[in-house]
Amino acid sequence: MDLATIAFAFSLVLLSGLSTSIGGALAVGKREPGPKFMAAALGLSAGVMLYVSFMEILPEALKKLESTLGDEARATWTMMGAFFAGIAIITIIDRLVPEEINPHEPATTEEEARRKRLIKTGMFTAFALAIHNFPEGFATFLSGLEAPEIAIPVAVAIAIHNIPEGIAVAVPLRSATGSRKKAFWWATLSGLAEPLGALIGFALLMPFIGPMTFGISFAVIAGIMVFISLDELLPTAEETGEHHCAIYGLIAGMAVMAVSLALFI
């Protein structure tokens, strides 16, 4: 594995992680993206993730496991176990991080209470997203090492998915502090967990990297991506109230992914 491949994979992770800063910039700007745009963008991201997971990443995982285990049945069971393990990992992370946080210290006025609540919400959201983005960073990095034709659309999908996360961090902080700069930088920092996850994951798994490691990791990655699509992206798209835009985006994401894979392969 040469340095250029490692640098390419890490660059993809860094760019997709830093897209939270786009969300931060939108949140501190004068205009926020409209509901139709957000629904379509989130649907597009979900479509890309779902299509590439089932049509490319899982078959690739099975191929690598078969080459190592030498038995299709064992490879299939191993792939299925790793896929649902990926779902379990991201589910546990999702369950451990509460959706809301209440202030622990009493405030002197209602406005002060609101301000403290918003500050804590924004900072806690940044922390929660950092934990949540950790496995996504490693997933993108590993894809970049082994299969660039998969890694590029995956990185784009994760980047789109990170934009509303940046907005979620920046909006309460901007409202509470009045500082656009602080809101923007907190949103940016929340995305840096992805390159950190890539570095730590690579350091831990580098001695074990081979067909078996890639096969299991790809199946785990597919599980993580499917969960994110079904639990986060599509529900968030639906919350905009633009159901059809979300579905059109979903179909468009699948179509774009199908065409891009056909052109690359």
UniProtKB/Swiss-Prot annotation:
Highest taxon in the source lineage: Bacteria
Protein's UniProt keywords contain DNA-binding: no
Alphabetical keyword list: Cell membrane, Ion transport, Iron, Membrane, Metal-binding, Transmembrane, Transmembrane helix, Transport, Zinc, Zinc transport
Topology of the protein relative to the lipid bilayer: Multi-pass membrane protein
Transmembrane segments: 6-26, 37-57, 77-97, 122-142, 150-170, 184-204, 208-228, 245-265
Record's GO cellular component terms: plasma membrane
Binding positions (Zn(2+)): 136, 161, 165
Subcellular location: Cell membrane
Principal subcellular localization: membrane
Binding positions (Fe(2+)): 133, 136, 162, 165, 194
GO molecular function (one): metal ion binding
Catalytic activity: Zn(2+)(in) = Zn(2+)(out)
Membership in a protein family: Belongs to the ZIP transporter (TC 2.A.5) family. ZupT subfamily.
HAMAP family xrefs: ZupT
Function summary: Mediates zinc uptake. May also transport other divalent cations.
Identification of the protein by name: Zinc transporter ZupT
This protein's encoding gene: zupT
